[in-house]
Amino acid sequence: MIRWRWIWFSISILLLVVAQPVSLRLRFDRSLHRMFAPDDPTRTDFEFLHSQFGVSDLVVFAYRDERLWAKDGNGLERLQRIRERIEAIPGVAIAMDLSKIDQMLEQLDQPFAIFRTPKGNGTRHVLLDEDNAITDAFKAIFEGQTHSRQGTLVAIACLLKPANQTTIAVRETLLNLRQIGDSLATEGLEDGMLVGQPVMVEEGFDEIEQDGKRLSIVSTTCLALLILIGFRSLRWAIISIAVVQWSLIMTRGLLAWLAWDLTMVSSMLGSIVTVIGVATTMHWMLGYQRAMKSQSNPEEALRYSMVGLWRPIVWACITDAIGFASLAFAKVGPVQDYGCMMAIASLVVLVGIFVLVPTMALLPVVPKRFAKSLGISYELAQIPGDEPLRKCLLGILKWVNRWPVAVAFAAMVICVIAVLGSLRLKVETDFIKNFRSDAPLVVAYQAVEKELGGAGVWDVILPAPKVLSQRYLDLVMDLEAKLLALEVPGMESLRLTKVMSFADVDHASRASPILGRLSIEARLMGMRQVMGSFVDTLITRPVDEQRFLRIMLRSREQAEAAQKEQLIADVRRTVDEAIRTDEWIVLFGDDAAASKAAVSGYYVLLTQLVSSVVADQWRCFAVATVGIWIAMSIALRSPWMALLTVLPNALPSFCILGWMGWTGTPVNLGAAMIAAVSMGLSVDSSLHYLIRFQRERSDGQSFQAALTSSQSEIGMAILLSTLALVLGFGSLATSNFIPTVVFGITASISMVGGLLSNLVVMPALLILSLGPRSERWKAN
């Protein structure tokens, strides 16, 4: 590699030039239903909902207007102007509000208007007519959907076009809606609010993209500054940045070429590439620094360090790849993709290290007499505090030598307690808690939760006869009454706050002198004329003798996980019981489609999202452990020594999950994959430590001398790389997306835990299993 370094370096630059434009095509898959296994009922029900009604993304545009019900109609006319601006957005399919309902009622009222006694207020708006029965009925139906009970919070329900019907991205549609909200000052109103599951998901993904870029930049910058300040080497600072950034671009280019998309699970791709690249670069740099003390020139020092380090570097990246590849055993597609992506990234870092470092480490930039002052000489300075740090590391080893049994026993006890705690894990189901409490989205949601009856929007899909009958609609309304009666106890009870379907709209329309005299199908045709495609979101047109009716549900988003899961289960049970009654069976006869009902929507998806991601965590963790043990057995040529690495590497993730279990801290997306990630973060250090120990022993060093050398030299590399990465991960604590904050904190804690495990638990296990004390035990 060193002899042909310029050839390899040229090839790497050529690959970089090719991969850079391709990497820009890597996309985010922002669909939530793919976060579930293909056969998961939650996913199949959602896909069924989407296939029947097409439009399933509901966004609520809300604002405050004290004059909404003004007798002069000023409030409704202002609302109409705002709605028409929203309807002009290409990505919006339907916008339903009070002004549209008012227009519909006016059309129904016009043929009989000449027989009405004129009102004293001279209003032109039927919706403002307090003596109109149909007006009162429609106000009641849409309360919580288009306006609050108090009447000051106005809502426009915006149904977005599905992806197959528009080229406009959801992000662009939401941006246009926000621009309208920001312009309400021209109407004399406060800025508008935008809520809805699509809004939460899009904002979450936006934050994740920004956080991934931030972590990559901050982590590599921290490492570069550490090298620049500590070792006074601009050369190696640039090398570390080059390795990480080259690996990132190449990985993203490969994924784009393979037509893979990033998801919410794999969004932290850059962070893991940074971890592997930083740790590997730091180990080689310190190995090169040691070699420079005994070798005559930089090339010999680099060759000497490469001979000593190629094996741990190669196997560290391979074990990383194996650990991540274990996620392919998960049932969820994005988790499988995440594992494959990270396995590829691990191998790309391996290539990047060997094609970039030899050339850049030996690159003659300026004459030697100027190189040192510029920080680009071949030599590296001693890091400030080097001797005290090494003494501290050896002091830890001395203490471990004295109490190895106590250390190992304490580690086992902690591990058992942590495992028991991890069995008590709860998942976070309130997606709004993924944002900071002062975020505009959270403030808007709190208003909707309080005044519109809840921000959780979901649906029941029921089969409907080809020709609607009054008996069928009565059964639907009976079911709605049962759904409204459901209540889940808790500190604050949870129930459905709104239930609405075509049956309610039809019932209210019968108060109209026109529609009340018509058949149900005729009323349906009339409503299609005045309400447009909104009716098609409530009931489908007959296709192959089948049609479906949609019951729109609303409930509080901010509730305990157990309550939300219980409410979903109760709704499913109630619906299942309803479609199995004798009356239902008589109505449909032998039609098999009569039993095809579903409960779905973003509320259901978000409630069960984290549970879906963590469902296979322990199985994947077990596969990763076995895979890493096999790889370590080959690398160390000792299955027993490889087994010694399992506990230190598993301990950090057990401790994090155990702490969350015992304290009742809900697991969100940021902590969902920490077990697999943590294993990959700490195994590299163990491998470097043990291979150095083996090499010292094969060179004739005593057990204690080999352990001391490993603790002093490799321990320093572990300490410095951990410091740089903890600073990088710590930068995520400033994110506005709470799962990113949790990921940064748990990853930092995991790395510190891995550091302690490798510098305390690992030596204790080596002493007990391979040291002089173990030989005495065997003799006894």
Spans of model-derived segments:
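Solvent-exposed, non-transmembrane loop/terminal regulatory segments of multi-pass membrane proteins
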Residues: 8, 23-67, 76, 122-149, ...
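Hydrophobic, glycine/alanine-rich multi-pass transmembrane helices and their short helix-loop junctions
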Residues: 226, 314-364, 627-633, 655-666, ...
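Helix-loop junctions and hydrophobic alpha-helical segments within the transmembrane domains
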Residues: 291-318, 697-720
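Interfacial helix-loop-helix hairpins and adjacent transmembrane helices
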Residues: 1-13, 293, 303, 351-415, ...
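Alpha-helical transmembrane helix bundles of large polytopic membrane transport and channel proteins
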Residues: 77-155, 169, 173, 191, ...
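Interfacial segments of transmembrane alpha-helices in multi-pass membrane proteins
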Residues: 209-260, 329-333, 619-664, 734
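Extracytoplasmic
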Residues: 51, 77, 122-234, 477, ...
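Hydrophobic transmembrane alpha-helices and their membrane-interface caps
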Residues: 236-284, 641-690, 730, 757-760
